Amino acid sequence: MVDRDIRIAVVGAGVAGLTVAALLRDRGVDCRVFERAPRLVAVGAGIQLSPNGVRVLHGLGLRDSLAATGVRARAIETRSWADGAPIARTPLGDRCEELYGAPYYLIHRADLHRCLTSLLPASAVELGRACARVEERPDAVRLHFTDGTMADADLVIGADGVHSVVRRSVVRDAPRYAGYAVHRGLVPASVVPSFRDDPRVMFWLGPGRHVTYYPVAGGRTVHFSAVGVSPEESPGGGPEDLGAAFGHWHEEVRRVVTSASSVTRWGLYDRDIPDRYATGRVVLLGDAAHPTLPYLSQGANQALEDVTTLVGCLDARPGAPQEAVRQYESLRLPRTAEVHRRARRLAEEFHLPDGPECTDRDQRMRATQDPTHLAWLYGRTAGLPDASDLAPRP
């Protein structure tokens, strides 16, 4: 088990930061989370939790909480933008659990955040502590905060997202704008009545754009994201802009994207995969390590894999955190690089113009719609600790 005398500081109270803190504190470790925001507010709306991520959350004791707040997806269904012609349907539901040992959940980010914060005492998360820089010393790491305060730790875990401050002490690079922007919103469940009997993820693919939507909040609300090519990362945009952008799309898509009372617009960023995720006593998790485009819906799920791998490595090397993070790095770099590479490729495939390339893509999707083709992503990965390898939370 992890050395209980080690002091661990986590920067960032997102999915990765809260989860790793919960696992470490379960082991009696002095672990504190430093979050720049003055209060915990979950940014965003829907999250797709695939079995590789759900297994981790089940291992934390959140099985009942996920079942109560999430929506168990029956399928991922892909259709063509204009006429709604079916392209592929990947069955999930019971089949997913049979293959991968956990369901596929659709959940509101705020609900997931509440599940994770319930695992920690309020004193474990220090709010309003914005990290300005990381100073690595021979015997410790010192965090410097923007308010002039400092904190020392034996190990610092950077879980502070795509614009990570902690990452600067490990890798010198910058986020890359991917050339796409996403509009996100929430609409009433009545907008997509078919979700009542067939809760699923809907993908609509078209030239230069795609739309995803699915039920969240126990089926009471539908989350959508509408992605389009955008050469410049400009702010703003509302439902009226979406109505114009998707004016020639299928009626259901138009109804979804124009039914929100408000939408948010975000540029999509990633970074190249570096040659390391750690240096000495500093290690990166989640988007701080490998920010990835969202086309595989793996942001939170890969972060959860990071957490179980890191904690498993710390368990295996008590008293030697630097060796543990080197092992974590060697295990996670190849895996996350493959997910990252495939996500970038899908950025092109999802937005092809109508024509021969689009037809070929649709045929490939039909040929791989059986969920067994997702074993590389959703199944247990050789050499990586999984939730069942970690002591369960009572």
Swiss-Prot record:
Per its UniProt record, the required cofactor names are: FAD
Keyword DNA repair appears in the UniProt entry: no
In this protein, the active site sits at 214 (proton acceptor)
**Which pathway or pathways does this protein act in?**
Antibiotic biosynthesis
Tell me the residue numbers annotated for binding FAD.
Answer: 16, 109, 287
**Reactions it catalyzes:** 3-amino-4-hydroxybenzoate + NADPH + O2 + H(+) = 3-amino-2,4-dihydroxybenzoate + NADP(+) + H2O
Source organism superkingdom = Bacteria
Q: Sorted alphabetically, which SUPFAM superfamilies does this protein's record hold?
A: FAD-linked reductases, C-terminal domain (SSF54373), FAD/NAD(P)-binding domain (SSF51905)
Q: Does the keyword Lyase apply?
A: no
Tell me a Gene Ontology molecular-function term this record carries: monooxygenase activity
Q: How is the cofactor bound?
A: Binds 1 FAD molecule per subunit.
Quote the EC number: 1.14.13.249
Instruction: Report the record's Gene Ontology biological process terms.
Output: antibiotic biosynthetic process
| Keywords annotated in UniProt | Antibiotic biosynthesis, FAD, Flavoprotein, Monooxygenase, NADP, Oxidoreductase
Q: Which family does it belong to?
A: Belongs to the 6-hydroxynicotinate 3-monooxygenase family.
Role played: Part of a gene cluster involved in the biosynthesis of cremeomycin, a light-sensitive o-diazoquinone with antibacterial and antiproliferative effects. Catalyzes the hydroxylation of 3-amino-4-hydroxybenzoate (3,4-AHBA) to 3-amino-2,4-dihydroxybenzoate (3,2,4-ADHBA).
Protein name stated in the entry: 3-amino-4-hydroxybenzoate 2-monooxygenase
Which organism is this entry from?
A: Streptomyces cremeus
